[in-house]
């Protein structure tokens, strides 16, 4: 016997450690002829198992383990597919089990599918006779070798295999302990069965009967199923009048061409070209299906992106409304999307606003039917850090040890335990004791195994037939899922479309809706001008916080250097600012500002590269060059581009000669041809799809346009989308303030869960207030909408439900200013809390009873809290300051010291900052130094205090204190940081500065005020302070007089003139 008929692979989640690759390797070495995959209830591993078997020339048998029941008794049963129909029966049976969450399978279910299946009962006892008899007369019925001897039936040796070798036995109890969230010692007591994958030699020692061997061989011969890949499973689109899909598609396209007045012959020729390729490849239904669901979205208040990926290079997509990018206008190539010389399924990914994406999926489900639409499964795996913690937990490691393990494994994508073991600290932990060594060995054996299923973020499978005819299904959090991954589902021919949720589309849509509602202005984003100077000024200033694709510090720096003037500049920046092409940014910017420096290898390259100043940025440019120079068709050019990006030497050499020969036939010099080939080879590795860049740059431009023209609504919606992130909220509020937009405290009668734009400014969200959850906010808003605005603090306290009314909620709302609208100081309202909490809750809900039985309430008026305390409470309850940041306030008061801010300071100038975080570390030499995070009320920046300076300041610096710092600015990891050389407490710096001052300059002051007459001194006095007036308009300095250098005179100057107009020198 050279077949194993009962293998549980690692896709039997947390019930097997048998990896398919390792299984097949061992089976091939041992000489196995056939293997049967029999995971319990699921078929997750079928494609991988099938492919590995075929590659190893091993006969794959498809099966499944189920627990069959008659309602009284349950028996473990293995079912195997005899043929392709049997394989489909397994798809349907597994789908039914998983969709209905059945752990035991009724006899009737199996009888429905058993015609093309082989049934093998395991460890059958007399009590199972009724179950077995239900299949009486079935020819392909077997009992495994250790079933009860008194039962009649054909016998076959069948022992489940769940791990590879005997020394892997401990993996099963470990997996079960992880699955059951229990300790390994408790599981070990129950696990006694030997379930390793045996060698052929071990099988021979079993002395199996001839009947068992004959029956095993019979089963192997009977099972002849295979997975059918690359089937034509595209659903058919139902046309309105029974037309063929081809005719209906052409009718729509011609109508749109005329309707949109695209009368240029080039459009008609391009359309004919694309239409022929699409219909020749049989994809007309695909385009109609995608067009239909996008049409639904656009007519049902769901915003759709302008395009994504290479599909924006298609005129057919544009005319069908799938994209809003005219490919001829932007010189985009259809063959980059759909290549007739490399037949693959088209791949149109669609961006929907993320808050309404489910609406479109629901439409598709309703249109095609419940079992005709599904998501796609993905698998979470036991990766290094996760498996190390899981195994540590089941082995009884305490939390301290588990945290130590997490810290010892480097935070590196894809790191393995073996790689972590190379670190001395990790190795020392492993060998600290025997328990740790065992932990490490078990962890390594489980590392990488699939742990759980999840749902692919975007992929949706659509068919006009039930999907379980082609692949098994299961359920996930969002509904049905294929049991096979995205690539596996696509490989068998199923239509997959990515429905992606894009937050920025939700922001754009909300701005449009709110502007319409509040200002009665209809914003048509397809009609906005793409030469708006205000937009390009915004981009040139780098004011792109919140702008899709353009908000990182690095991109903002590039925009400032580039000074964009055209939409093409945005397209170039979004394409260049990526690893690889980033090194070409400086070249691009230099040439952009100095077009005369651009040189081309050959004049024929100029029309292709002129827009990018001789720099190859886009994949389409490579294709255009190959077509122009070597005479390649666009299909051939796309194949060349792909070959170049994959760096396959053999293919590259072949393509190189192909290119040079083609160029020679076109009359190009051989040396020039080689240089051009090498040029495109250099850029092919990171060339960006221009169609995608144009599409996403359009979103970036739209957001920039809205930011410029509707800033209140822009910031309100951006802020609403970062609720929960203090850092992002604080940064965005900071920027809004600097744009002179008023940030208003939460208002109990105006604010919502989201931020609200108004003609006064932006009301903060009630959701930003710490200690107030969503449900409380919802109840407050619901009550206000149902019964009108709150009249005063007492009215609010009476109307909100008792279950949410407490001191913490009321204090939070008061201290952030939510009740300021009622005209009482926050101190007064704090004093009133005890009154409202003492109200008789039994009568609160009845307004008449309340008025009759409750004494009239009144406020005990209190003077307002100090400004600093109000600011501190704002920071405490919101995470940021509504009013000016304390550092900004201090800066305004202390400008006479000649201090600067981080944003406008330069090397070794005094800068006023607050330290938000201080991280002290020890260097390799054992010296202390510190990394600090500073802010000046507007800008945040990292700072470094090296050991030689830190020893001087170590005891005097603390978090959330203000200092004057001097140092040198340096760029590190694309971010500016300050190397701090000197540090002063503000008062100490001021004392030193004033004491050493020899003169004072007063801006735009022509004479001293009378109060300084008594302070004047003669010019020869030692302690004289010279006073000068500076006339800005005339750029002229005038001596105004001298006063004594005394503190009281300094204070008098500061009180008399604005701090911004005084400079002590």
From Swiss-Prot:
<dbReference type="GO" id="GO:0003676">
    <property type="term" value="F:nucleic acid binding"/>
</dbReference>
<dbReference type="Pfam" id="PF17657">
    <property type="entry name" value="DNA_pol3_finger"/>
</dbReference>
<dbReference type="InterPro" id="IPR004805">
    <property type="entry name" value="DnaE2/DnaE/PolC"/>
</dbReference>
<dbReference type="GO" id="GO:0008408">
    <property type="term" value="F:3'-5' exonuclease activity"/>
</dbReference>
<keyword id="KW-0963">Cytoplasm</keyword>
<dbReference type="Pfam" id="PF01336">
    <property type="entry name" value="tRNA_anti-codon"/>
</dbReference>
<dbReference type="InterPro" id="IPR016195">
    <property type="entry name" value="Pol/histidinol_Pase-like"/>
</dbReference>
<protein>
    <recommendedName>
        <fullName>DNA polymerase III subunit alpha</fullName>
        <ecNumber>2.7.7.7</ecNumber>
    </recommendedName>
</protein>
<comment type="function">
    <text>DNA polymerase III is a complex, multichain enzyme responsible for most of the replicative synthesis in bacteria. This DNA polymerase also exhibits 3' to 5' exonuclease activity. The alpha chain is the DNA polymerase.</text>
</comment>
<keyword id="KW-0235">DNA replication</keyword>
<dbReference type="GO" id="GO:0005737">
    <property type="term" value="C:cytoplasm"/>
</dbReference>
<comment type="subunit">
    <text>DNA polymerase III contains a core (composed of alpha, epsilon and theta chains) that associates with a tau subunit. This core dimerizes to form the PolIII' complex. PolIII' associates with the gamma complex (composed of gamma, delta, delta', psi and chi chains) and with the beta chain to form the complete DNA polymerase III complex.</text>
</comment>
<dbReference type="GO" id="GO:0003887">
    <property type="term" value="F:DNA-directed DNA polymerase activity"/>
</dbReference>
<dbReference type="InterPro" id="IPR029460">
    <property type="entry name" value="DNAPol_HHH"/>
</dbReference>
<dbReference type="Pfam" id="PF07733">
    <property type="entry name" value="DNA_pol3_alpha"/>
</dbReference>
<dbReference type="InterPro" id="IPR004365">
    <property type="entry name" value="NA-bd_OB_tRNA"/>
</dbReference>
<dbReference type="Pfam" id="PF02811">
    <property type="entry name" value="PHP"/>
</dbReference>
<dbReference type="InterPro" id="IPR040982">
    <property type="entry name" value="DNA_pol3_finger"/>
</dbReference>
<dbReference type="GO" id="GO:0006260">
    <property type="term" value="P:DNA replication"/>
</dbReference>
<keyword id="KW-0239">DNA-directed DNA polymerase</keyword>
<comment type="similarity">
    <text>Belongs to the DNA polymerase type-C family. DnaE subfamily.</text>
</comment>
<dbReference type="InterPro" id="IPR003141">
    <property type="entry name" value="Pol/His_phosphatase_N"/>
</dbReference>
<dbReference type="Pfam" id="PF14579">
    <property type="entry name" value="HHH_6"/>
</dbReference>
<keyword id="KW-0808">Transferase</keyword>
<keyword id="KW-0548">Nucleotidyltransferase</keyword>
<dbReference type="InterPro" id="IPR004013">
    <property type="entry name" value="PHP_dom"/>
</dbReference>
<dbReference type="InterPro" id="IPR041931">
    <property type="entry name" value="DNA_pol3_alpha_thumb_dom"/>
</dbReference>
<dbReference type="InterPro" id="IPR011708">
    <property type="entry name" value="DNA_pol3_alpha_NTPase_dom"/>
</dbReference>
